Amino acid sequence: MNQVIKTIALCYQKYISRASNKTFSIHNTLSLSLLPKCLLGSLIIYTSHAFGEMELAISGHKYGKDRDAFTMISSCPEGTNYMINRKLILSEFSSLDKFSSGGAFKNLAGKIAFLGKHSSSSIHFKHLNINGFGSGIFSESAIEFSDLRKLVAFGSESTGGIFTARDDISFKNNHYIAFRNNIAKGNGGVILLQGDERGTVSFTDQQGAIIFANNQALVSPSIKHSGRGGAISGDFAGSRIIFLNNQQITFEENSAVHGGAIYNKNGVVEFLGNGGTLSFKENSTRANGGAIYTGKFKANQQTAPIIFSQNNANQKGGAIYAQYVNLEQNQDAIRFENNSAKEGGGAISSSQCAITAHNSITFSNNFAGDLGGGAILLGGKQPSLSLVAHNGNIAFIGNTMLPATKKASLPRNNSILVKESPYKIQFAANKNRSIIFFDPVIALSPSTSPVEINSPEHETPFFSPKGTIVFSGANLIDDAKEDIANRTSIFNQPVLLHNGTLSIESGAHLVVQSFKQTGGRISLSPGSSLALYTTNTLFHGNVSSTDPLEINGLSLGVDTSPSNLYSEIRAGSAPLKLSGSPDIHDPERLFYENRDSAASPYQMEILLSSDKIIDVSNFTIDAPVPNKEAGFQGSWHFSWQPNTVNNTKHKVLRASWIPTGEYILEPSRVGNAIPNSLWSTFLLLQTASHNLGDHLCNNSDLVPTSYLGLLIGGIGAEMRTYSAEKESFISRSGTTGTTIIRLTPTLTLSGGATHMFGDSFVTKLPEFIASEGMVQNVGLTQILGPLTVKSTLCAALDHNAMIRLSAQKNHTRAKWDTFGIRGTLGASYSLLDYENMVRIFTFANVEATNVLQKSFTETGYNPRSFARTRLTNIAVPVGIGYEFCLSNHSFALLGKGHIGYSRDIKRKNPVTFAQLAMNNFSWTANGCQVPTSAHTIANQLILRYKACSLYVNAVATKLESTYLSSSLSCGGYVGF
């Protein structure tokens, strides 16, 4: 039987070679199951289970002009492997007149695999149009793509998928994958997972980008449920679509009726451990899930950003429509921005949503229709929400919904809307982390299940639930601020504060069914309120609980600017119980930096009201609260408004700030890094000057230049300073170019430019300075027998940019220029000259450097202004050096070095005058101290072959055992 098949294989191979393009080749290594459709029946008999896995080598360009010979059919039950030697292109095939699946490949049995066997192995599917499934590949079993350099599909059309299978579809260890402009008149614009059993679409260990762009799934009258998954669609319940350990993943401008990019209604869509940016941009759907429609969506352990931007759904879930959404253990930022849903859930529509931030997570400018949920809509029975700020903050800002009212209305700010009675709502923030709602949260359906804030169940060795949950009206524009609904969050559920801080600020209002505090603090800033949910509130609903409103840690929050508004706590028909003692909440410490508020007496009030009783028997207000940190000094004193002292239903608590008039500057704001940055320009000039002079050897016979020399190389330098108080570090790196012209046998002129980038900082200070400088230089060397005279002149312009990081919001930035000039004049004298091979000499130089920094003012909150400052230094280095030359007719090894001692005979250290204009406070800032004497060591080697040379040059300056500065350069040199 084996002999029969081999004979048939040869016949079919000849048939294919006649029928197809000459550039297309197939090499059968075992037996042939790659056949034209018309001969399929006779082959099935011979490719039974008696044979093992089929392997065929394939490459070339095959056109679809002959439709009967284009489709390759396989049916080996043990599987068929296509070995892709180099580039395989399958293009220009059209078969729309009859329904038939499988355009380029049709696999009837066993797994079909496409395996790259060369570093350039690739497959291209172009313009394959069929009336059936799988315009590229249709398989009754699994499909696999492995080890391909490229896998591309472009401009193809089918009833469903370019790749369609009734079993798993896997992509493993490929490099570049791109699927663009493909159409399915059914489901799955690119990939369709069919079958009666759950299957998996997997992308694993891809080395390059994965791109799905401009793919579509359209409605087909002949298919009951169509238009699903513009890029990928899974039909069967429990199917899985997973991207594991890949690099960049992009879904852009895909569209469908459901799931603009991915559809897997009753299955899982998961992104796990990918190292490149995961991006869903401008995908759209006529129904639900602008980017993704699935049962469960998970994105975990990503090490690069996740971005959902400008996705759109005509119904729900502008970005994601899923029963369950889980984001956790992602190490980079996550952004949901400018997504929209015409009905609800501008970014996410879900029943269960669990989000944990290990880096920042931001929902910004998402929009929903009248169902609400500008960012997130939670529906279904007993929805649940868990937001946890672990190592990053979570923020909702600028999200809106269009309320369903009879009157024409502007969009209303809304971050989250919980439509049904929730099973669970949890907010937890790690210490020094926060969850910030600049847009309200609405949960109107009543429930006895509490909203848990910083619950102890989140406590772990790595997580302390002592962070801040913020409801704020700070980012509203003026027109939006006038509508109180844009600042009001409502929970028709009990709210429990266990730990950390609940901050209601900048005119925000929090309305709750009941409130109980067992730990932590609740803070209200002027114009903000906490109220129980009653029929008298702006939003009508159930009467609030009669359980006492209990607060055992009350703080008054301060805004950045003075306010005459009071804050409120309204208990309605419930008793109000206060215990503990009051405090002031200003985590960013902006109040104490503001002269308008903190330099003068200031007062805040909080109104307490209850129709039952206000119990303050365990609430003490005697102890003042002083400012124990930097800023304007003073203390807060608490008292009851006199006419409310004995009132048991209405009280006003007053906090009065009494300043002392003293201002203490925060140590990290002194700005020592600014004058210290002049040493960065000094290092730039010094490095360029040394690099120029070191290429001028004293003896003309040692210099590989007759008339003209050109030098190009890389250069790097660093400088450190140490003291008992602080340490600074400066580094520079870049490129240099020099032209050397021999004017006479004893007179050499050189000139060039050096371009270097740099970084500098002072330890324990949050100021980081980046620099970019250019040096123009010129040098002259005159040899007068045993005496050599050298001079150099360098001029530099350095651009500096600084960011000052802060644990608070008051980051500042600055840009300024620094100018520098350096001149050197020196002489060396030969002590020993042995046949132009070895030379020992002594030297003495004078090096004068002047650096000027321009004045500048930071940008940001309460910026600092720094006056111009100067660094002047005159140094005299002396020492002993050597030169040697080993050469033959073609090669030469040249060396030069010295050991010296340098003494600064004049030094003006940089000191700058600084000022805080907002606080009318000024001081002086000093750079780090740099020693005025040090030892230097330098060595240079040049390896020359005829007119070409390679060089390496190293210079180190040290004091005792501590290095102060060092530089290293290397490059190429051509002399004529």
UniProtKB/Swiss-Prot annotation:
Q: Which residues form the Autotransporter domain?
A: 671-976
The annotated topology with respect to the bilayer is:
Peripheral membrane protein
Principal cellular location given in the protein's record: secreted
Task: Give the gene that encodes this protein.
Answer: pmpA
Q: Does the keyword Nucleus apply?
A: no
Q: Where in the cell is it found?
A: Secreted, Cell wall; Cell outer membrane
Q: Which residues form a coiled coil?
A: none
Keywords for this entry? Answer: Cell outer membrane, Cell wall, Membrane, Secreted, Signal, Transmembrane, Transmembrane beta strand
Signal sequence: where?
A: 1-50
Q: Which domain of life is it from?
A: Bacteria
Stored Pfam families:
Chlam_PMP (PF02415), ChlamPMP_M (PF07548)
Family according to the record: Belongs to the PMP outer membrane protein family.
User: What is this protein's name?
Assistant: Probable outer membrane protein PmpA
Which GO cellular component terms are attached?
A: cell outer membrane; extracellular region
